[in-house]
Regions:
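Short, Lys/Arg-rich N-terminal segment immediately upstream of the first membrane anchor
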Residues: 1-6
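Compositionally biased intrinsically disordered regions enriched in Thr/Gly
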Residues: 7-259
Length: 259
């Protein structure tokens, strides 16, 4: 048999293997189904200045490895959002138990200090982006549990579609240094168009540590979204700061990009 024929057969086999593998992945991912879970709670027999909790999160249907890991992570995140006033994170408490604890704590405080303003928690989750290897979920959150100001935040979570494991920031990109350099440019552009003051020699508002990526980073179709909590930039900041980096510039370094 000629070498060219063997080579062609090898290429054909490789192509068929990729097609079969791709079709199998498509069938698996197309079977993933999500449902929205909505929970609304308020203080019983309350007419004015009432505690309010609004939760909208996703649950993956079925019993696949992805569904089990995804649902466990979401359960943990929502429960800890409800228990955000506690000192330590919980990993084995249900959302219902956490909700009962939150409302009970508020009712106990309100009983002794009826003049306190009503607490309010809002959480809304949605899938922001997905390819054949991963998906990004965004959780928009609002929390007022006393104090001077309410807290608004975004939490992005990335899931590997083959098993539902969380993709950490450290594993999100193949070259974090290059992504950081690209992000730094867009941070500066966004900063110059905002009211953030210049604090250090590089022209950024970081407290002596230099520019760095935030803890919360989200992927959308068009942008890598960098969501900086106030304390991540400077101690004097009282509001979050969002930077959008064109996805086309960082896509080459995405660990879970399409083949």
């Amino acid at each position: 048999m000629k070498k060219s024929s063997v080579k062609k057969r090898g290429i054909l086999c490789s192509v068929l293997s990729l097609l079969i593998s791709g079709y199998s992945l498509y069938r698996y991912f197309s079977k993933l189904r999500f449902e929205e879970v909505a929970i609304e709670r308020s203080t019983d027999n309350c007419e004015d200045n009432c505690l309010s909790v609004s939760l909208n999160y996703l649950r993956c249907k079925g019993n696949s490895e992805f569904a089990q890991n995804f649902n466990k992570e979401i359960e943990t995140q929502v429960a800890n959002f409800l228990l955000s006033n506690e000192d330590t994170l919980q990993v084995d408490v249900s959302i219902e138990k956490a909700l009962e604890s939150f409302m009970s704590d508020y009712n106990n405080i309100h009983e002794h200090f009826p003049e306190i303003p009503a607490y309010e928690l809002i959480l809304s989750d949605s899938i922001m982006w997905q390819n054949s290897k991963m998906l990004t979920l965004v959780s928009n959150r609002y929390s007022f549990t006393g104090g001077a100001n309410a807290v608004q935040s975004k939490v992005f979570t990335h899931f590997a579609l083959d098993n539902g494991e969380v993709i950490t920031n450290e594993n999100l990109f193949t070259d974090e240094a290059k992504v950081t350099a690209i992000a730094e440019k867009y941070f500066k552009q966004t900063q110059e168009a905002s009211v953030i003051e210049v604090l250090d020699d590089k022209g950024f508002g970081f407290d002596g540590n230099g520019f760095h990526l935030p803890k919360s980073m989200g992927i959308s179709a068009d942008y890598l979204i960098l969501f900086y909590e106030p304390f991540e930039i400077a101690s004097y900041m009282d509001a979050a700061f969002e930077v959008k980096v064109p996805m086309k510039e960082v896509m080459p370094y995405l660990t879970f990009k399409e083949d």
